[in-house]
């Protein structure tokens, strides 16, 4: 189903007929075919993305294998990257986007305080969905929900443990599932730009 719909999008961009001789995308945009990104949790999805020369999008978190709730995210995603790179046609430059949860505050204690309600809510949702979450502290949740939270020093140290970031061509940050105020979100963006970004490039 996914492949069929992706093919339809390609056809539309080329300006092909869409279900009726008079239906065409105007203006056609065939150049968009070189800008497709595919999000996947699996090696199989990464292989398909690589074979097609698409970009690979990696999630900020993803389910752990049964019995391994504390398996690091990069241990799951590095094999996905390996499969993608192996499948890329010769001469096609890799495009790998790693999305990550990061909330940065001037005070480490303040960051944890702001993060706790949202992380507890996400942990409860994971458990209700049948996923195993160990422990009940903010520290437990940070590791298992892949959230990088704290003052700049702590977040830099946390991100440094994620080997996927060194392999990514693009990195994006979001505050979800932390639920900060608008002001705290803007301050986090500012701190990421000033203190975090220089350390991950």
Task: Please give the residue ranges for each predicted region.
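Active-site-adjacent structural elements that line small-molecule/cofactor binding pockets in enzymes
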Residues: 1-201
């Amino acid at each position: 189903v996914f492949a069929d719909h992706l093919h339809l999008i390609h056809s539309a961009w080329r300006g092909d007929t869409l279900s009726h001789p008079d239906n065409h995308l105007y203006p056609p945009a065939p150049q968009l075919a070189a800008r497709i990104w595919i999000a996947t949790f699996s090696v199989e999805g990464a292989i398909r993305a690589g074979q097609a020369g698409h970009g690979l999008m990696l999630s900020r978190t993803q389910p752990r294998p049964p019995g391994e709730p504390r398996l690091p995210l990069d241990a799951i995603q590095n094999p996905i990257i390996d499969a993608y790179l192996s499948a890329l046609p010769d001469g096609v430059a890799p495009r790998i986007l790693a999305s990550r949860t990061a909330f940065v505050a001037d005070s480490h204690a303040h960051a944890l305080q702001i993060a706790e309600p949202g992380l507890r809510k996400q942990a409860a949702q994971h458990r209700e969905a049948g996923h195993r979450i160990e422990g009940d502290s903010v520290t437990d949740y940070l590791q298992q929900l892949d959230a990088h939270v704290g003052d700049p020093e702590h977040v830099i140290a946390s991100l440094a443990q994620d080997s996927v970031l060194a392999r990514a061509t693009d990195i994006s940050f979001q505050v979800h599932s932390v639920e900060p105020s608008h002001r705290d979100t803007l301050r986090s963006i500012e701190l990421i730009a000033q203190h975090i970004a220089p350390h991950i490039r």
